[in-house]
Structures are given as C-alpha cells and as structure tokens.
C-alpha cells in the first residue's frame, strides 16, 4: 500500500570516493548485545544507523548514535541546514551506503545525498523517517563536533561556530516571520473567497450566467476531442449502457429528457430500449454533429434535439418521465452541471418520475507519496541553481487532477457527501463536513485525495454502480489531490480528524473553492 518501500538495507557501495566505509565499532561487542536487541512482540523497532541495535523510537536511536558512535543528528542537521527532504535523503543515504561515522562527520558542502534517489526509503516503516526534523530547529546551544586535527585553530573555529549558530538562529527566525506573514495573506485570501461565496445566490448562479460569461465552458464541449475521451472511458459509458439496457422497463414508452446530451449516446441508448420520445438538450456546437449521428442511426423519429441551455429553452412537452444526464465533473461537483439537472427536475419532471444517476457520494482518503510531493513542492527550492521557493505558495493552493497510485493510500476512505438527486437542492451542493480518516499504514501523510462513486438504484431490477476511486479501474475523472504544505507522520490505526468545506467560486461558479483542515493546519484550494 503506501508504507515506506523496502530497500536493500546495509552494506551497499558508497561510490567512487576512496573512503573506508566500514563502521569503526567493535564487532565482538555486537554479539553481546544481541540479547537486548530482540523487539518485543507487536512493537515496531528500527535499527541504529551505524550498528545492529534496535530501538523503539527515533529519539532513542539518535541518543544511542550520539553516545556510542559520536554521531549527533542535531549538529548534522544544523551544520548542513537540512529541512524535511534533506533530512529524509540523509537517513536513506546512510541506510543505503553504510558510511563510517568519521566520514559523515567530515562532510562539507556539497553533500553526497543531494540526488532525489535518496528520497526512496531503504527500510519499510523506518521510524527515523517519521521523525519531525523541525523539532531540532531550536537555538543552537552546543558547538558542532568537527574532525580531529584542528586544535591549533580552536579559538578561531569556536568563534566561527558561534557565528554560524547565531546566523542559523536568525535565519530560522526570519523564516518563521515570513511564514507568519504568508499565513496572514492566506487568511485574508480565504476570508475574501469564502465571503464571496457566502454572499452569492447559489440557487441561481448557473442559470443567471450570460452567454459571454459561460461561453468558454460550452465552447470546450464543442470540439470532438472531449467527447472522444468520454466515450472511450469504458467505466463511464458502459455503466450508463448497462443501466439502460438491463433496466428497459424504466424507459419503455416513457418521455425521456437528456440534459447535456453531447453526441447523443445516452439518448440513443434510451431510444433503443423503447422510449416513446427522447428530448436531447445541449448548448455546445457538438449538437450539430449529434443531429447527423441521430440521422445516421435512423432515430430521428424518436429523438428530438434542442440547442440551448436547459434553463432557457422551451421543451415540446410540459413534463417528462425520466431525466438522464452525465453531469459529473472532477471531484463530482466541478463545472456545476448538476445545478442544471436539478433545475430540469424541478421544472419538467412528472410526479413519480426519476432522475439518473440517482445516488452519488464523495470520499476522501489519505495519501503518502514523498517523491511526488518533493517533485511538486521541493523542486522550487533549487531551479537550475536559483531559489524559487516563493512559488510554493502558488502551487499548493491548486488542486491537482491526476491518477493516484493505490499503493500510496494510507487510510480507509471516508464519505464526506451523500447526494440523492431526487431530494437534494442546489443549495445543498455547497457544504461543510467533518471527517475521520482511519490510517492503515505508518508513513508520512503528504496529501488527501478525493473521488466519487455513482449509483443507479431507484426502481432498478439490475443495480449498476461505478467508482472513480484509486483502487478502481481508471476513469477520465481520475482523482483530485490536495497536496499538504507540510507532510506529517502518522502511525497505523490513527484517527485523523479533519473538516472540509466546498463552495462555488462567486467569480466563476463552475469552479470550486475547497478548504481543508487536517492536523491543525488549514489550506484553501481552488479547482478550476
């Protein structure tokens, strides 16, 4: 799943450097310690960086390294200015290359663990990789331990060490001040975005959009490419086909409304199983191709095509028996097309009629993908030798739509929204929800992913369900990923409590603003 991947352990070659990489410890002493290194049943232990002793925590391991091997992780982190990813690389470098303590203490910049290959864990569930390196960034009160042979310059070295400690402390204080300033900016941004949303009329935003405001949305569906992608999505298209073909009683001799018909595929499915009349509505230019498609398949006597927004057109009937639509967007609600379906339901659906799909859920799941997080976030720390870390503040607030590797999941999913299309209203589509993610792996939590499930249930003799989750067959909806600014360690069995708020963006009501609170940290994301 998403636990830290196992590696080849100790004893690997360091590389071309002519260095002695065996530990200077006494082998004979190890056998005497074996009796003390057996882990208690059911407890997680991790080995020392320089010998075979096992410990139950990172703190115990580092204390042992300092006392027995003269390796001070505090000094090492401060000496090289290591943050989250640098620390991860350091630990994996030592695990993989098995260098001596003397070699590690002799290293100056550039360090040998800069490559991204050292982001890959060597030991599964390594407790040292779950240690919060920021805990080490307190004012430095003890000098660094430098190699022997510099005693003749001791006074100069001491002064330099104290100057370096003061510089590091000042740099850390400046970083904290910048972070506080950014939090203030983020708070102001979140406040403005949420006020915008709360003050808008969510029951009419989509219906009230003018042609010049909504033209880009509909023009994007005028090109064949997006329809080709959707039609080739077998999970999507075959689920609709199976629902209609396996439940013909729902459509036979009924009047059907297809909202956002596109190429007309759902309308043709309905016509094939005996619908009396199908009214297909779409505002995009693809409707003209749909007209040709309907004629080619000799269904023009059953299917009536109407170009325009469902909120603006006049239908040739007062009421319909069935409404069908493929309205789902990323994270289910992106594009706000469900608003149009609900509008059609309230205006045109006959008493006792049905809307399909009828049930939808949105779920969240925790993700651990340190390498991908580094690629997206740590990348900006050094771009061809230049510091572009300020770009992180622009990258993190944008939700990412991508396929999540199911092996990176570290929790059970949690439903945050249940929608019954027969009873829900447009105002229900903006919501807040508390959630709890039960972790299944010990790892670093780097992101939260969202997805949705779709159900065709009402009056069905053969129920049809499909999921867009990471553990199901890939769909064109993929998953929506909310990257965490600061990953944090979790242990298997933990209950991660959080809160999510989903609103339309007032300036663009087809896009979403998502505010996520997790691990005492709040971040607002845009999906647009």
Swiss-Prot record:
Pfam families: ANM3_C2H2_Zf, ANM3_zf-C2H2, PrmA, PRMT_C
Cited SUPFAM superfamilies: beta-beta-alpha zinc fingers, S-adenosyl-L-methionine-dependent methyltransferases
PTM sites of type Phosphoserine: 22, 24, 169
Active site per database record: 326, 335
Gene Ontology molecular function: any one: protein-arginine omega-N asymmetric methyltransferase activity
This protein's record includes keyword Amino-acid biosynthesis: no
Enzyme Commission numbers on file: 2.1.1.319
Job of this protein: Protein-arginine N-methyltransferase that catalyzes both the monomethylation and asymmetric dimethylation of the guanidino nitrogens of arginine residues in target proteins, and therefore falls into the group of type I methyltransferases. Catalyzes the asymmetric arginine dimethylation at multiple sites in the Arg/Gly-rich region of small ribosomal subunit protein uS5/RPS2. Also appears to methylate other ribosomal proteins. May regulate retinoic acid synthesis and signaling by inhibiting ALDH1A1 retinal dehydrogenase activity.
Protein name per UniProt: Protein arginine N-methyltransferase 3
Species in which this protein is naturally found: Mus musculus (Mouse)
Gene (name only): Prmt3
